[in-house]
């Protein structure tokens, strides 16, 4: 059985978030009101609520890089990850860390991007 998650986070601009998650990322919108919207987030449920997002700081030490904390991510098959990266790049997404491979040639090698 595959375990699924539900994550609810704040976004400042719900219309902009609908465009990004629905249009750019290709997620299907589900239930919604004027203050929140649910998305099928690659098989998981992402619930975006209008409000002030968590503050982030670059305090996570990963492979000699300081990454934003807190953060969340997806583990995708590489072809699906690459297609998503291309969609995000084509849309002019402002990346914190552009798509790249981390831990190259090592156990746990991973493709990553932060935006």
Put a short name on every predicted segment.
Residues 1-3, 65-69, 106-107:
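Short glycine-enriched loop/turn motifs at secondary-structure junctions
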Residues 5, 25, 33-35, 70, ...:
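Residue-level marker for the onset of beta-strands and adjacent loop->beta junctions
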